[in-house]
Curated annotation (Swiss-Prot):
Enzyme class: transferase
Role summary: Specifically catalyzes the N1-methylation of pseudouridine at position 54 (Psi54) in tRNAs.
Entry-linked HAMAP family: tRNA_methyltr_TrmY
EC number(s) on file: 2.1.1.257
Species: Methanococcus maripaludis (strain C6 / ATCC BAA-1332)
Protein's name according to its UniProt entry: tRNA (pseudouridine(54)-N(1))-methyltransferase
Top-rank lineage group of the source organism: Archaea
Gene: trmY
Length: 198
């Protein structure tokens, strides 16, 4: 199982989303939509072995975590507007400590970025933090029977405190490129690496 989590520092935390202004008034929700696209959509199929989390820290009610489960997703199209509509529905739910399903395979909860990562660590997932200054990809060995969580930052990053948290947790810091990449591009590169193990 492949899982991804992104800290969305400015992404809105209620359903008041302007679909005509995803990058601006919605707190770079366009970036989140592109990550969902990269996590799940193939040319004529979807990745069913993937889960994607976004933890939104924008106004008015942070944090709100969103969970997308590939094996359960239905009716979502790959374009940003369609994905944003489904995110809007999820954010219209009153978030609580429990995951609440808004539409098939999409859930929301009142959870912190660190809490989800800690939970995945306790489940035995191998945690990778994707960072420009990490060890080169070639230095790591991946096995097809392992479960992974890949941690991503948005255009702002995850911040020093969360980086320290990941280091203390034993997350492996990995670099996919000598150049700084967009989060959605990193997801595609990770998928490509793991696809080749099959």
């Amino acid at each position: 199982m492949k899982e991804f989590i992104i800290k969305a520092n400015k992404a809105v935390t209620n359903g008041e989303i302007n679909l005509k202004d995803l990058p601006g008034s919605s707190g770079r929700l366009d970036l989140l939509c592109r990550c969902v696209n990269s996590a799940f959509f193939l040319s004529h199929d979807m990745r069913r072995d993937t889960i994607f989390y976004s933890v939104n820290y924008g106004s008015p009610n942070p944090p709100v975590a969103l969970k997308f489960v590939g094996s359960e997703l239905k009716r979502v199209s790959p374009d940003e507007r369609s994905i944003a509509l489904f995110i809007k529905k999820a954010l219209e739910k009153d978030a609580s400590d429990l995951w609440k399903e808004s539409t098939s395979g999409i859930y929301s909860s009142k959870r912190e970025f660190r809490d989800i990562i800690s939970e995945k660590k306790s489940e035995g997932k191998r945690i990778f933090y994707l960072h420009l200054n990490g060890k080169p990809l070639e230095d790591f060995e991946f096995k097809d029977d392992e479960d992974f969580l890949f941690v991503l930052g948005d255009h702002i990053g995850i911040g020093d405190e969360d980086e320290e948290f990941l280091e203390e947790l034993g997350a492996e810091k990995i670099s996919l490129s000598p150049l700084e990449l967009h989060a959605d591009h990193c997801i595609i590169l990770v998928h490509n690496i793991l696809d080749r193990l099959k």
